[in-house]
From Swiss-Prot:
Family, as annotated: Belongs to the UPF0220 family.
Membrane topology listed for this record: Multi-pass membrane protein
Entry annotated with the keyword Plastid: no
Name of the protein: Transmembrane protein 50 homolog
Amino acid sequence: MRKTIMKYLPALAGIIFTAGWFLWIDGHVYENTNNKNADFDGPHIQWIYYLPGIFATLGMVMANIVDLSALNSNSLLFDGGATKVRVWLFISFAISFGCIGAALWIMVAVFLPPHNTNDAAQWPGIAITLQTSLIFLSSLLLVFKKVRQDDEYDQF
């Protein structure tokens, strides 16, 4: 059972990643469709609202291009490889958390009341928050798969 789950974990991460971007595209299309109505008074999506998703994707790539076998080093201070990997992973996860924070900020400051009084215009803000959260979740699943793959041969 465990091997089957580990086998399909990257596919699940890809589905979650795709769902995140799909939700954001859906939110943007929803906003553009509503803007064609003459009585729509909601906020308009600007190019800067794409940045949390783009940087969350960058953080996911950064977390998954690193070789995690370098973390198995015994010496913390003398081995530069393990320290570099730890710093790289810290930066990638800091970028991902920052993107979630930026998406929450955009949602609260632009798309939710009292800044936006139109209830129909709240979906893009929710979509951008879901997007960055799902991208981060897919990144965690892929890193977990890599960690468990390294531990697969350990019996203890």
